[in-house]
Amino acid sequence: QLGTPISSLMAWTEILKETYPKDDLIPEMDKDVKRLQLIADRFSKIGSQPELVPSSLNQIMDHVFDYMDRRTSQSIKIMKEMPVHDLIVTINASLFEWVIENLAKNAVDAMGGKAGVITLHVEEEAGKAVIEVSDTGKGIKKKDIGNVFRPGFTTKKRGWGLGLSLARRIVEEYHHGKICVKSSEVGKGTTFRIELKL
């Protein structure tokens, strides 16, 4: 159902590129429309059993880092802590990338427009790939930690509160992994942790 309006947007951006070949904003618009197509494709996989294939975790984290780094305020520093050797995990790369991106976007929101640091950390631990997304944002109240993965739970003024609920479904049901709030302190920040079998 999303395909038709997205195809329309793609056609319009092609026309704009031809009409205004020197405009710097049109290639960015084109990237965002292509990204919208990718997201629509990802969501069409929800409900059906997605195909899992051996994929480079380092490459996925690089994609998320590059995407977030280009679209995040300069007052927020995004850092990567990766193992020297590549970790290969059996996943659906586009869905899993969406999960990490969603955690990173939540981390940006947690800063509330202030300066801070987001860290994307990957390591191998006891036959598992461990991914942690940490921020120095506002933190989650203790009473709310148990609810963050519940559909509809949100502390934001806009949005439906479905991101973390969907992230848990993708990690735990489709990838047989684990996702949790590793730690959170009000005024100091939050760390989300994902574990996947290698």
Named regions from a protein language model:
Residues V117-G127:
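Short beta-strand/loop element within the Bergerat-fold HATPase_c
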Residues G163, A167:
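Short alpha-helical Gxxx[C/S/T] motif in the catalytic ATP-binding
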